[in-house]
A protein has these predicted regions:
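Anion-binding (especially nucleotide phosphate/pyrophosphate-binding) glycine-rich loop
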Residues: 1-149
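FAD-binding subdomain of flavoenzyme oxidoreductases
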Residues: 113-114, 124-206
Length: 206
């Protein structure tokens, strides 16, 4: 039986009743839907680097997104300062540092200052990770989510994500207040991240 100790970087946490690691977008949605339909506690995790879990059994479902594809979507028209914006999409389960390396190798700027932060792409926008005065919010175009309340996928824009210091509308939706929108979802938010689209630009150094 899988335990949280197997999934967290700190190596502690009790056994998990059901552990799922879907490899498709549909699989992620179905795993979440199944847990919600049965009224089971649901915990969707990323890299397990920001978790301290009790050693008592977790009688619910833990989902870890095993998808990690990254793709360049397009190149938009030049913005006002003359730079060309490049849209890059990454699936939620992609390791954050692997994503940063991918972008740097393509000569793209916007997330390189956040290299070395543990976790996944999906978790990065929930937490609005940051370092050295930079936050992931500054490079996010939109986030595709599964809305557990309305049972549908949804595209949330940067503005709709209400990013703040280590906070987002995604994270806030775990709590009854002061969530935007308010909902009782815990320990996983109302919105489960499926993929993130970033707006990056070409590096001047190539």
């Amino acid at each position: 039986m899988t335990s949280f100790a197997d999934l967290t970087t700190i190596g502690v946490g009790g056994p998990i009743a059901t552990f799922l690691e879907p490899t498709t977008r549909v699989g992620v949605i179905e795993a979440v839907e199944e847990a919600d339909s049965q009224g089971l506690p649901l915990c969707v995790i990323g890299g397990g680097s920001n978790m301290l879990v009790a050693d008592t059994p977790f009688d619910g479902v833990v989902v870890r997104d095993a998808r990690h594809a990254v793709s360049v979507l397009d190149e938009a028209a030049p913005v006002e300062n003359g730079e060309t914006i490049v849209h890059v999409n990454a699936e939620a389960g992609c390791n954050w540092d692997d994503f940063v390396d991918y972008c740097v190798n393509l000569g793209l700027e916007g997330v390189e200052g956040l290299s070395g932060i543990p976790g996944t792409v999906g978790a990065s926008v929930v937490q609005n990770i940051g370092a050295y005065g930079q936050e992931v919010a500054s490079s996010v175009e939109s986030v595709e989510v599964w809305d557990r309340k309305n049972k549908q996928t949804k595209e949330l824009t940067n503005q709709e994500l209400h990013f703040g210091y280590r906070m987002s509308a995604l994270k806030a939706s775990m709590y009854s207040a002061p969530a935007t929108p308010a909902a009782d979802f815990f320990p996983t938010p109302r919105y489960v991240v499926l993929s993130v689209t970033f707006a990056l630009h070409h590096s001047e150094t190539g």
